[in-house]
Amino acid sequence: MKTLVLVAVLGVASLYLLSSASEVQQLSPAEEEFRAFVSTFGGLFETEERGVDSEDCRAMFGGCGEDNDCCLHLGCKTTKLPPFANPYCAWDGTTGRK
């Protein structure tokens, strides 16, 4: 019984060492060059969507005057019953990147 437990513990330890050794993988020069190339484009792939990464966009249930005041995937809504005052930002039914 002691031998079986010892073998099991050694097996788990060897699997741990093998998995941690595979995580410590060095990048090839081509991979490093590709990552540097992609990072040079910086903001090229960023979109000009309303409210994306905008500090002045309004969050959920924040006051608004129009859809552009609200953050991404939020639209300016009003209550359906009178009074129609106090519009707020609410989910506009979209998901993902536009």
Curated annotation (Swiss-Prot):
GO terms for cellular component: extracellular region. Transmembrane segments: none annotated. Disulfide bonds join 57-71, 64-76, 70-89. The keyword Disulfide bond applies. Keywords: Disulfide bond, Ion channel impairing toxin, Knottin, Secreted, Signal, Toxin. The presence of a 'disulfide through disulfide knot' structurally defines this protein as a knottin. Ion channel inhibitor. This is U10-barytoxin-Tl1a. It comes from Trittame loki (Brush-footed trapdoor spider).
